[in-house]
Amino acid sequence: MSRDEIYRQSQSFLDDFGFGESVATVFDDMLERSVPFYAELQRMIAEMAGDFAMPHTRIYDFGCSTGTTLIGLDQAIGPRGLTLVGVDNSQEMLAKCRAKMAGHAFANAVELIRADLNQGVVMENASLALMILTLQFVRPLYRDRLVRAIHDGLEENGALVLVEKVLGESSLFNRSFIKYYYEFKKRNGYTELEIAQKREALENVLVPYKLAENLEMLESAGFRYVDVFFKWYNFVGIVAVK
């Protein structure tokens, strides 16, 4: 696994954060060192998927990146006649995904699709949809519409599993949670320069909502049951059932 050192050196000009080749190459390391309890989150997602993945349906992973979640789902669920559909807008991420998947003997069918979630989604025969640290990168203007489209594309009793970075409900807690998160990143080997430069690159690219705003968006989209299954300061996991 290549180590994430994209922001290791001081840069006089920072491009907006994107998912091109440089990020795709180190993305697995970036996630493991930047997302609290990342391995446990993956295990929990696969565990829940086992309850919602109906035989002979499709599971959509929107923002599948390098395929870690799809591989984990397939291993946990086993053969059910499913089609696992990975959707991403980055050609470089999809290339890394294909390469990683080549080393895994899948028990279910797999499809990879390039698509821009800002333009909506097309789903069929879907029992489960995943958005793991993805919705936060969709332009706020399109989020409500996207979540409604996912709800409408799910079969009855189908589920959406959503993991997001969130804002604190108050400015007091928000400042504290950000401070704790940066301390977490330092413990995982990131320098203050790396943290500051990545924060600047992500500004206006990653736009988090408050937890309450995400819950309201899911309920407004029509989901009957919505609950939080994971919370760590400014990271949250939500499951919603149609």
Swiss-Prot record:
Key words of the record: S-adenosyl-L-methionine, Transferase
Gene3D superfamilies tied to this protein: Vaccinia Virus protein VP39
Sites where the protein binds S-adenosyl-L-methionine: Y38, G63, C64, S65, D88, N89, D116, L117, R199
Keyword Ribosomal protein: no
CDD domains membership: AdoMet_MTases
Reaction(s) this enzyme catalyzes, per UniProt: prephenate + S-adenosyl-L-methionine = carboxy-S-adenosyl-L-methionine + 3-phenylpyruvate + H2O
Function: Catalyzes the conversion of S-adenosyl-L-methionine (SAM) to carboxy-S-adenosyl-L-methionine (Cx-SAM).
Subunit structure, interactors included: Homodimer.
This protein's name: Carboxy-S-adenosyl-L-methionine synthase
Gene of this entry: cmoA
